[in-house]
A protein has these predicted regions:
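NAD(P)+-binding Rossmann beta1-loop-alpha1 motif at the extreme N-terminus of oxidoreductases
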Residues: 1-67, 92, 97
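Amphipathic alpha-helical hairpins
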Residues: 13, 17, 63, 69, ...
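Hydrophobic beta-strand scaffold residues
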Residues: 29, 50, 119-120, 161, ...
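Rossmann-fold NAD(P) dinucleotide-binding segment
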Residues: 54-66, 70-117
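Rossmann-fold dinucleotide-binding core
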Residues: 99-178
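Helical "substrate-binding/catalytic lid" subdomain
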Residues: 169-292
């Protein structure tokens, strides 16, 4: 069976490794990115074509995949001059691997559907190293028939591929997951910071908390920095701040509010303003340790 031609926009660390995995598996890829260096790395492996127009890339592809930073960037790529909406063929599919606002995803999906184009939101779990080997966790959502159409491709990109329901459910689930994770890390980091201010030994605090129900991978994650001074970059404060902002907006769109998310978002923004944006989330410990009333 002939493999579909894949258009891929967004060749950052995650996206670049995802494309390398596709190339190793014999896919023809059409790529677009602001970084010529990233594009050149793809072209050097062969079976690849560079595009500078999203419209033209879409017209030359059966499935278009996005691995972009924000909902605003996704909307610009879709709706902008020479955008995907103008170029995607009837029967083709758009897959958004980023973490986006569900309301935006649903709007894009509805506009694509008017052209006979399907859409799947499929935010990712795990790391760029997993992406290179096709071992990601993929939280896909969208029309069941569209999902089944692209599942053979997703199975080559992810070890665990979940179908979570209607379009937008993937992004909703990812934002809920990140809300739980980032609020937990921020809380634990402040706990270590308060202990330091109070003269309580961080290792002893960790030993006590990890012996009870508070023990978790997140606790270990925070301890690496707050106690051991080791920064293991997994997720930046800037990205956490963006995702918490999306979660707050999503909750507001649902007619509710989240005071917990708003408070955590305020702390993350303060850490960004303090110059910690590109550091790992547990480094927010430094912000809390210096925080004065």
């Amino acid at each position: 069976m002939t493999k579909p031609v894949i258009g891929f926009i967004g060749l950052g660390l995650m996206g670049g490794n995802m494309v390398e995995n596709l190339q190793k598996r014999g896919y023809q890829v059409n790529v677009m990115d602001l970084s010529q260096t990233a594009v050149d790395a793809v072209l050097a492996r062969g079976n690849a074509t560079q595009f500078t127009s999203a419209k033209e890339l879409a017209a030359a592809s059966d499935i278009v995949e996005l691995c972009l930073t924000t909902s605003a960037v996704v909307e610009k790529i879709v709706y902008g001059e020479d955008g995907l909406l103008a170029g995607m063929k009837e029967g083709s599919v758009l897959i958004d691997f980023g973490t986006s606002i569900p309301a935006s995803t649903k709007k894009i999906g509805a506009d694509l559907a008017e052209k006979g184009v399907g859409m799947i939101d499929a935010p990712l779990g795990r790391t760029p190293a997993h992406a290179k080997d096709g071992l990601l966790n993929i939280m896909a959502a969208g029309d069941k028939d569209t999902f089944e159409k692209v599942k053979p491709l997703l199975d080559e990109q992810g070890e665990n591929v979940f179908h979570l329901g209607a379009l937008g459910a993937g992004h909703t689930t990812k934002l809920i997951n990140n809300f739980m994770g980032m609020t937990t890390v921020a809380t634990m980091s402040q706990a270590f910071a308060v202990a330091k201010k109070a003269g309580v030994d961080g290792q002893q605090l960790f030993d006590i908390m990890s012996a009870g129900p508070s023990n978790s991978p997140f606790m270990q994650f925070c301890k690496f920095y707050a106690v051991d001074g080791e920064e293991k970059l997994g997720f930046s404060i800037a990205n956490a701040n963006k995702d918490l902002g999306y979660f707050v907006q999503m909750v507001e769109d649902l007619g509710s509010e989240s005071l917990i998310a708003e408070a955590t978002s305020k702390s993350l923004q303060a850490a960004v303003d303090a110059g910690l944006a590109q550091h790992d989330v547990p480094v927010i410990f430094d912000y809390f340790a210096k925080l004065e009333k």
